[in-house]
Amino acid sequence: MKTLKNLISLIILTVCAGSSAFAQNTPEVKLDVPYVPTRPAVVEAMLKLAKVKSTDILYDLGCGDGRIVITAAKKYGVTGKGIDINPERIKEANQNAKEANVTGKVNFETANLFETDFSQATVVTLYLLPSVNLRLRPILLKQLQPGSRIVSHDFDMGDWKPEQTIEVDGATIYLWTVPAKK
């Protein structure tokens, strides 16, 4: 069942990627992952699973419209950063932050995830494809401090077993805590 659900998610992500490429009038940006927004109930569950608190610094990788970072700032007082390779998504995220009155708590940047420093983050959220999660895993483990939490919507990190997995609104959410450095 889980494999079928992941297959359906991959198909939806692929279809959305194809249709959004035709709809945009901006120069083509090479995307590793299509933009599919995380539903509000899933955003709330991700933040709750990570036990987000006001002292956390949350990074959302592939932030899209910024909804996870913005929700964390509004609900928990978190300082956050959203990173996306698509400048149109960053423009939208900045507008959403302005409308939510959280521009002093959040920022968004257009960047390549594989060339970004995550070392300040205490919580990392992501809704990326399995292949991207696997490429990011060694970077996150190297850069993040022990005790930092990683929460993924729908896709795991290969053979790194999550500490906790929950189902919310048809989505699977995974939680890992960065272990002590060896």
PLM region descriptions:
Residues 2-12, 21-56, 87-120:
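S-adenosyl-L-methionine
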Residues 55-64:
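Conserved class I S-adenosyl-L-methionine
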Residues 66-70:
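Glycine-rich SAM-binding Motif I of class I
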Residues 73-77:
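Gly/Ala-rich phosphate-binding loop of Rossmann-like dinucleotide-binding domains
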Residues 79-84:
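Conserved SAM-binding motif I beta-strand of class I
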Residues 119-135:
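A short SAM/SAH-binding and catalytic strip from SAM-dependent methyltransferases
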Residues 131-182:
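C-terminal substrate-binding/active-site "lid" region of AdoMet-derived donor-dependent transferases
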